[in-house]
Amino acid sequence: MQKLELLYEGKAKRIYRTEAADMVWVEYKDSATAFNGEKKATITGKGRLNNEITTLLFRKLQEVGIKTHFVEKLSDTEQLVKKVSIIPLEVVTRNVIAGSLSKRLGMEEGTALTTPIVEFYYKDDDLGDPLVTEDHIRLLNVATPEQVSVLRDAALQINQVMIEHFASCRVRLVDFKLEFGVTEEGEIILADEISPDTCRLWDETSNEKFDKDVFRRDLGNLTEAYEEILKRLGGASHV
């Protein structure tokens, strides 16, 4: 498989065409952003860590029958994935009150939820990726009610697998963001990535943060935090 021309460059990844019409080549970048791109930095090794962690987690999900776009890891920072049309919704599942939910509802960060909360955010940088209801989604015409139901059910299924998997590594899955895409056959599958960029991950005992909040809040060394997650997941740490 060959990497051909650049199709798209986002905040954290570059997407390239391949000679296969149904595959694209993903390259993870060493860039870190927060607050919708207002805070930026280049952090050596971050692309490798996100690629390694995403590979491990997507393989875990595939083992239990959850369909993803992941095909294979190509290098430390690259992977081959199925080409999909991304649904412009971020699907956020929350198990613990943190971040914007804490601010929005005035509830204490760290409070465990009795049942997970699923939220949808409209993917639009100019609008700041606003929180939307199912009625808003219908108005925007970005997904059908049936597709929204599929996204919610998939997010909750993935959440249960991930909670158990991270718990086995002594990590608390606080919340995480998923993106989904539609294949040429019309099937909705998990896309994008699952990494400390897209999850809040706390040590189960100390609540030490091992995610992008380390960068957002200037809490320490981001690569060391991500390396700790990779190590706990059984990956090859480069520390």
From Swiss-Prot:
GO BP of this protein: 'de novo' IMP biosynthetic process; cobalamin biosynthetic process
Domain of life: Bacteria
Keyword line: ATP-binding, Ligase, Nucleotide-binding, Purine biosynthesis
Gene Ontology MF: a single term: ATP binding
Pathway given in the UniProt record: Purine metabolism; IMP biosynthesis via de novo pathway; 5-amino-1-(5-phospho-D-ribosyl)imidazole-4-carboxamide from 5-amino-1-(5-phospho-D-ribosyl)imidazole-4-carboxylate: step 1/2
Gene3D superfamilies hit by this protein: ATP-grasp fold, B domain, Phosphorylase Kinase, domain 1
UniProt-listed Enzyme Commission number(s): 6.3.2.6
Catalysed transformations (reactions): 5-amino-1-(5-phospho-D-ribosyl)imidazole-4-carboxylate + L-aspartate + ATP = (2S)-2-[5-amino-1-(5-phospho-beta-D-ribosyl)imidazole-4-carboxamido]succinate + ADP + phosphate + 2 H(+)
Signal peptide bounds: none
Annotated InterPro entries: SAICAR_synt/ADE2_N, SAICAR_synt_PurC, SAICAR_synth, SAICAR_synthetase, SAICAR_synthetase_CS
Family, as annotated: Belongs to the SAICAR synthetase family.
HAMAP family assigned to the protein according to its UniProt record, in alphabetical order: SAICAR_synth
Name of the featured protein: Phosphoribosylaminoimidazole-succinocarboxamide synthase
Species, as recorded: Bacillus mycoides (strain KBAB4)
Gene field: purC
